[in-house]
């Protein structure tokens, strides 16, 4: 898609967001947005299903409530993006940078997050993310946080703490364990 055409669609979407009567909701279904600069764009509620956003710059973009089902965001930069309540089901998010991104209540069912940077992001822990494809690095990151919190919790039972101690070695393989503090018992 040409830059001018994309700028026009974004401008019409901005108008639509203001009052819902002027402008037009962005519909970029299946669009080729490879390498597009959408940094800081307000794409709330936009339809990006099936779009190719490979290597797109979406830093600080507002994609809350967007439909991104089946989109390809391979190697896209979503640093600080708002993806809350977005439908990311079946989305290719491999090697994407989600540092500091808000994924609250996002639907990640069937999404592939292999190699994605999830540091400082808000990843949903609900049924909509149970079929998400995380890689070993991310699973170790989650495990580290669960084990560390569980062992430090005054509310966790001894039974739970005993089971968590069995996972310390794996949890300490978290890529930032040295910085955050290795788990010791």
What kind of region is each of these model predictions?
Residues 1-35, 39, 44, 49, ...:
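Intrinsic low-complexity/IDR segments
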């Amino acid at each position: 898609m040409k830059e001018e055409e994309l700028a026009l669609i974004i401008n019409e979407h901005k108008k639509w967001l203001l009052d819902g009567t002027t402008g037009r909701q962005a519909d970029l279904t299946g669009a080729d947005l490879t390498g597009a600069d959408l940094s800081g764009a307000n794409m709330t509620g936009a339809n990006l299903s099936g779009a190719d956003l490979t290597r797109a710059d979406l830093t600080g973009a507002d994609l809350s409530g967007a439909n991104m089902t089946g989109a390809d965001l391979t190697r896209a930069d979503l640093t600080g993006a708002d993806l809350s309540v977005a439908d990311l089901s079946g989305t290719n998010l491999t090697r994407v940078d989600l540092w500091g991104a808000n994924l609250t209540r996002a639907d990640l069912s069937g999404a592939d997050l292999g190699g994605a940077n999830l540091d400082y992001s808000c990843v949903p822990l609900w049924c909509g993310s149970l079929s998400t494809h995380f890689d070993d690095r991310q699973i170790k990151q989650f495990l580290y946080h669960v084990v560390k919190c569980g062992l430090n919790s005054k509310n966790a039972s001894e039974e739970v703490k005993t089971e968590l101690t069995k996972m310390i070695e794996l949890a300490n393989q978290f890529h930032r364990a040295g910085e955050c503090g290795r788990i010791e018992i």
